[in-house]
UniProtKB/Swiss-Prot annotation:
Residues 1-351 are annotated as: A. It is found in: Cytoplasm. CDD domains: HATPase_Hsp90-like. This is Chaperone protein HtpG. Molecular chaperone. Has ATPase activity. PANTHER family: HEAT SHOCK PROTEIN 90 FAMILY MEMBER. It comes from Nocardia farcinica (strain IFM 10152). Residues 352-568 are annotated as: B. The gene is htpG. Homodimer. HAMAP family: HSP90.
Amino acid sequence: MTEHVEQLEFQAETHQLLELMIHSVYSNKDTFLRELISNASDALDKLRLESFKDKDLHVDTADLHIELEVDKDNRILTVRDNGIGMSRAEVVDLIGTLAKSGTAELRRKLSEAKSEAAAEELIGQFGIGFYSTFMVADKVTLTTRKAGETGGTRWESSAGSSTYTIEDLAEAPQGTAVSLHLKPADEEDHLYDYTQEWKLREIVKKYSDFIAWPIRMQVERTVTEGEGEDKQEKTIVEEQTLNSRKALWTRPRGEVSDEEYKEFYKHVSHAWDEPLEIIPLKAEGTFEYQALLFLPSQAPFDLFTREHKRGVQLYVKRVFIMDNCEELMPEYLRFVKGVVDAQDLSLNVSREILQQDRQIQMIRKRLVKKVLATVKDLQQAEDQSKYQTFWREFGRVLKEGLLSDFDNRETILQVSSFASTHSDSELTTLAQYVERMPEGQDAIYYMTGESRQQVESSPHMEAFKAKGREVLILTDPVDEMWVGSVPEFDGKRFQSIAKGEVDLESEEEKKASEALREQQDKEFADLLSWLGKTLEENIKEVRLTNRLTTSPACLVGDVFDFTPMLERMYRASGQPVPVSKRILELNPTHPLVTGLRDAYDQRKQDADEGKVPELTETAELLYGTAVLAEGGELKDPARFAHILTDRLTRTL
């Protein structure tokens, strides 16, 4: 008996994805079954966990399992579980639509999806494996009842349709059943006959052998009865379990194939990329646990969103306890996937207890050290390709640990790589930078900015280019944060070339230029004083500098001042920005600066009384160009544009 039947439209992105699945040229269509079995396994895990937590939930957990049912005559394959099930609302949320956080990115990916592996990549990145069923089925029916509820829900859609139906069921077995009305077999299109027992066995063995729950199927086999002349063959049907159910993390690494590890990674991470590195661990003694961790080869699309779920799966004596156990992995390692199986925790442990549990804290410390040691091994390997992939995908995230993990800060610094002026294409480690430092240099020079091009064209770089001094180019938003909190590396302090006074001259050069500096200080003293008063709303000091070679001026901050990029980051996040004025530094050899000095000296009294507006405007232009050159924002861009336009007009 059914009631409350609705026909609903798929979200636009969902329908696009379904079309991609229906017309997919992706050759490995077998993976649809892996996705359905993985979903069923999750549902069984959740039911057992819920039964531990909720004593009012009266469910039978004695025989939790997954069942494959084949109807050869009608070409229907059903994957059934007696797990947690779903409510009507959950069915619509999980199957009828996609997560809103990913729709814009998915729309872009769909428009670019032209390669053979596009379907698999999209499924993995957006966690929507259920849709892979439309690679092999003309129609899909899902029937489900949530544990503890009386009525069920049926969802149904056909290939090519922009709609789906959903209806309430007065009665339904607990759990979820997904029935696929299979397309005709077409081996040229890698579309096999999924009603064949041998094919289903092959897929389960390849992709799902490690699943903890029994995967059962009714199979036909021939038996011989009687003896002698009475001997005869008879076909019987019996239920068989298709998977070995042995947890991979309990097996020695030498006994597990790379293919098994890859499939297990895809199961626990709900991703479709391959693991970059496999990290098995086993600890005995005070705290007994086993772990199997993976470094992914591709960052998920939501790695930097609040919706991203982090943490590894937690088991206790092979009993699933929770997904995304944040207490076992810090935020900056949120990309690490895998399982941890502890021996001495309670089965009904809560997140609140985990936060205070000493054993969990010790396991976490060891896991973090092992992950960082693995990254270090990749970095020091002769073949750098794995490390380069890791750093490209996860370097920005790893550097967040410099702000939060003081115990491992030195290791994080060691395994980090940075762009620098030493090479246009290759990154450098801090150790390599220090090794190249010339004698007498006591600081690691760096500059932050939005892009390499912006940093390299900054006036602050001019003296460093002229002297051949290497500068780290830091363009990730997190760089703005950590460089202010990490004092040094290998005894060398970090020095921003856009903050404080930078002295690149040797003692001999200082002695040789001392007389010239004294002369310049005298010649420019009055101009500097006038500029300081004229621009006092924007700056706190004007001074001469030797850091410029081709630009007339630049702005620098004190050591603890915000950079323009950091100010923008704070404003974008709605945080208050401390009010601070910067220092305007002038190049005493630039024609614009010497010309302004001469013009001021000729009309000093009038200028001091504010009677020479063109000099005031020149001062504003000088300051404005310094702001723009470092990527800053003008307070009154309209006035700056008006003055500049007027000045340019006079030149014609």
